[in-house]
From Swiss-Prot:
Record protein name field: Procyclic form-specific polypeptide A-alpha
Highest classification ranks of the organism: Eukaryota, Discoba, Euglenozoa, Kinetoplastea, Metakinetoplastina
Matches recorded under InterPro entries: Trypano_PARP (IPR008882)
Sequence repeats: 48-52, 56-60, 61-65, 66-70, 71-75, 76-80, 81-85
Propeptide intervals in chain numbering: 93-114
Acidic residues bias: start-end ranges: 47-89
Amino acid sequence: MAPRSLYLLAILLFSANLFAGVGFAAAADESASNVIVKGGKGKEREDGPEEPEETGPEETGPEETGPEETGPEETGPEETGPEETEPEPEPGAATLKSVALPFAVAAAALVAAF
């Protein structure tokens, strides 16, 4: 039977990795949203709040349009660009491997302690 200190160490490792995983998830989520709200107040942008531009009265006169020109219709196969691949993650960004690996180690330590 393992001593109590091993049980406590395993629980400590698991909870530390849990909080680290939450931190990784928050860091990954922060890049998606650049504006973090605190206390119900939004963070103002550096360029100031957006205000609609004032425009003068619009002139709505009759528009003269010429005969519509139709271009030659292409019946050949359309050229497609190279297939899009997933972009590489930013350096230091949280990935599934970087978050799941500490949990796996902590879970193995927890199982080994019991």
